[in-house]
Amino acid sequence: MGFCRTFIHKKLMIFSVRKLSYIIYIVITSFFIVKNQFIDIGDETYVNQVRSDEYTKNLAMNLTQNCANDKTCEVQAMLDFVTAIPYKINESVARSSKQVVTQNFGDCDDKSNLLISLLKAKGYEAYFVLVPEHIFVIVSLPTKLNTNALYVNDKRFYILESTAKGSKIGFPLRYKMDEIKAIIDPFSNKKLVINKLEYK
């Protein structure tokens, strides 16, 4: 019986150490996840909910499966899906991709987080653009389209408006250049350094 008690005691100690290690891992991981969701923009703080999970990757693959690697087709297919989700103001912070899809509603934060997560899953260079009381997505495409684009440091990006149902790539810029508060990479949680900004 002495051996049995000692063995059980050792097992409990191993279990406790493993459990403690797991809790520490969760706390540290959660800290970095939360830290990477917040970014300060002047006097304001923006919270993102971008995702690079299997759900988002599979959704992006399904939405673009008929595009035969046509980049314009892929981006438009993902944009069509997001804009078809009903617009409804979300009083809390932005929700995850899966929540927006399953609950079937979202505001500009929610829908932009979903859209940029889908674009990221397919390997596109895309950013958030923060303007007064709104956020939209810009994406880089290899093909020059017959529409205006936002040139960031001389690189061409097309505006994607997630809240306008049926909108197309290259949505018109409806803000003055000095109203653009920041252009953000939400996956690295960094603001782009902008030396030159043009819309043409």
Mark where each language-model region is:
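A structural boundary/capping signal
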Residues: 1-200
